[in-house]
Amino acid sequence: DRKEPLFGRRDALIKLNPFRTDTIKEIIKDYKPDYSNEDLLALYTYTGGVPKYIELFMDNLVTDKDSMISYMIRDNSLFVSEGKNILIEEFGKDYGTYFSILGCISTGINTQANIEGALGGISIGGFLKRLVEDYSLIAKIRPYGASEGGKNIKYEISDNFLRFWFKYIHKNRSIVEMGNWKLLKKIISDDYTTYTGDILERYFRQKMIESMEYRYIGNWWNPKNTENQCEIDIIAVSADNTRVDIFEVKRNPERYKEGVLKEKVDHLLTKQKELKKCTLTLGNLSMLDM
């Protein structure tokens, strides 16, 4: 029944596997043979590969960024009510706190201390634990080389669509309630280039996971309050532990500066000396590499 939430109930929420990146490419090519990588990125951004979302777009010949935004942001759109429909029943009476936490994470407030500060100092450790372990809705992200017990942790929403829903639909509830779809579409469109920069990183990490060539894929950043603030987008350690591929992700390859990445890697090597034994490959991943 198309009036039902797209994910269904509890069992589907946990078990429904998204399509692989190569399958997403095959699907959009079937419906739009001349698709651009921008079309592909938009499809990945808004669906994360979830079959039902892709089906809704493709069945309605919605194959580019602007038409996807217009299809989602309108009267009686399942996408507008989707986050609420699939999660309120899951969370029960505590849904308000869970929604506030997920809303914070979607906007980049992504450490436990910062989330607690944003929510007035309430303790959220138990909520975060359940979001990670029971609901599989968020993931703990640690920088390369950090110990399991370390406190240098960020959280991210695992599902692309829910990340989008909390950042734009939930955050702009008053605009949604007024039905001011024109304004909401403008907010989403104006932010699209910036927002999809992070999603492009996620796309490449997913693609690398699917390649089965690596034993570790992640990123690295300095802890706060250190002299050299720097972040490396992707660090991937080969299956045989002899090669480390290090990438800066930029939508536009012309914005990549090899010297800047090399400086970051030099700093990383002062912290993670074991990497000096490996062959290091530095490079850029951009829209052209999707």
Label each residue range with its predicted role:
Residues 151-290:
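A cross-kingdom feature that marks ATP-driven nucleic-acid transaction machinery
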Residues 1-182, 186:
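Phosphate-binding site recognition
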